[in-house]
Amino acid sequence: MVAHRATRRKRASATQLYKTCKLSGTCPEDVINKVEQKTWADRILQWGSLFTYFGGLGIGTGSGSGGRAGYVPLGSRPSTIVDVTPARPPIVVESVGPTDPSIVTLVEESSVINSGAGVPNFTGSGGFEVTSSSTTTPAVLDITPTSSTVHVSSTTITNPLYIDPPVIEAPQTGEVSGNILISTPTSGIHSYEEIPMQTFAIHGTGNEPISSTPIPGFRRLAAPRLYSRAFQQVRVTDPAFLDNPTTLISADNPVFEGADTTLTFSPSGVAPDPDFMDIVALHRPAFTTRRTGVRFSRLGKKATMQTRRGTQIGARVHYYYDISPIAQADEIEMQPLLSTDNSFDGLYDIYANIDDEAPISFRQSGATPSAQLPIKPSTLSFASNTANVTAPLGNVWETPFYSGPDIVLPTGPSTWPFVPQSPSDVTHDVYIQGATFALWPVYFFKRRRRKRIPYFFADGDVAA
């Protein structure tokens, strides 16, 4: 049997404890601070509210109406409501005193009304004289205004976006002069001849890329800039100018920036080299070629004078070091690499005449045994139709052509299974195992009109 747990009694809240213990003075400090809003969080909010004011923005824990203007969707502008107050006539309010009558009459007394001018008195018994008149002229009013000066102005604005091409006026005849006239082709009959313009190269070779970004080249100082009158020419003979020029200007600095950058110096005492006196800047190096050789150049700036304002005035110096001279090219007599005689070179030509060839032997030095390949002469067969072969390989070497031996291509057996004969009834010089073969040289330079190539060649003649 499961025992029932006792019901947990709810603890009194801080507000309930404050009501019972405040009178007796036994309330804990945290209960008093929480109820009276004296905690650190409440104090921070109270101090911050002294400097900020969010009234009228609808920020709070109310009904969520969004303030007086309501919520505005994102990406839209709030609608503007204009309050129009109806016009009312002004009402004059008269104060009523204690001595004034309580009943106000609607009609004023006649004695108070001002009648204005007096009534005229007529004398005599004749009465009034009645006069009648008649006229036939119509009553026409002259409504013509007085003469005035009228100025009429007109302005014409041409907008190329709203001009129809057929409406464009054809240009006049161009002037025959050295100028280039570029016009827009229009409709209609022209008084001149339209010649299409072609692109031509004025500067350069004409092979410069025009449709893509070219590879940026290296910026080099032109020779006339280095050897002009604006620069003082100084020749340097110390090799330290190539890799460590700071030793020629100031004391040796172990933390060297590099020889391929612009070096700056502060004008100090005496320089180790008198040619580098008062140098404040030494620009990056440049290699140039002269008639005498290859030259290593640097531009330097001196600060010989300095004004009170701090402006440095000095000459610009061109320091150069000749690396290597360029000697005149010696004329070397050219020797032929190969001779024209048909000497034995250790290779076997399958198209050579076998009767004129000698046995091929391969010899090696040392203990390696030698091997000899004997070649047996055989009768050569020629076709009835022969043709001369001419291969334009050049005039340097003479290329001899000979008729080759009999070549037997592989053929499939007529019966199956195929039993090879032993020994073979026909003895040939060369056997080809496979479908690869060497083409006759005359077909190397023949223009191909079709993709068909003869399957094989025998004895230098085409097998039809």
UniProtKB/Swiss-Prot annotation:
Does the entry annotate any disulfide bonds, and if so which pairs?
C21-C27
Keyword Ribonucleoprotein set for record: no
GO biological process, any: viral penetration into host nucleus
Q: Where is this motif: Nuclear localization signal?
A: 1-12, 445-453
Q: What's the stated role of this polypeptide?
A: Minor protein of the capsid that localizes along the inner surface of the virion, within the central cavities beneath the L1 pentamers. Plays a role in capsid stabilization through interaction with the major capsid protein L1. Once the virion enters the host cell, L2 escorts the genomic DNA into the nucleus by promoting escape from the endosomal compartments and traffic through the host Golgi network.
Q: Which GO terms describe its molecular function?
A: DNA binding; structural molecule activity
**Coiled-coil positions:** none
Family named by the database record: Belongs to the papillomaviridae L2 protein family.
Q: Which GO terms describe its cellular component?
A: host cell; host cell endosome; host cell Golgi apparatus; host cell nucleus; viral capsid
Q: Cellular location of this protein?
A: Virion; Host nucleus; Host early endosome; Host Golgi apparatus
State what protein this is by name. Minor capsid protein L2
Q: What PTM annotation applies here?
A: Highly phosphorylated.
Report the source organism: Human papillomavirus 66
Indicate the quaternary assembly: Interacts with major capsid protein L1. Interacts with E2; this interaction inhibits E2 transcriptional activity but not the DNA replication function E2. Interacts with host GADD45GIP1. Interacts with host HSPA8; this interaction is required for L2 nuclear translocation. Interacts with host importins KPNB2 and KPNB3. Forms a complex with importin alpha2-beta1 heterodimers via interaction with the importin alpha2 adapter. Interacts with host DYNLT1; this interaction is essential for virus intracellular transport during entry.
Keywords from UniProt, A to Z, are: Capsid protein, Cytoplasmic inwards viral transport, Disulfide bond, DNA-binding, Host endosome, Host Golgi apparatus, Host nucleus, Host-virus interaction, Late protein, Microtubular inwards viral transport, Phosphoprotein, Viral penetration into host nucleus, Virion, Virus entry into host cell
Q: Does the keyword Phosphoprotein apply?
A: yes
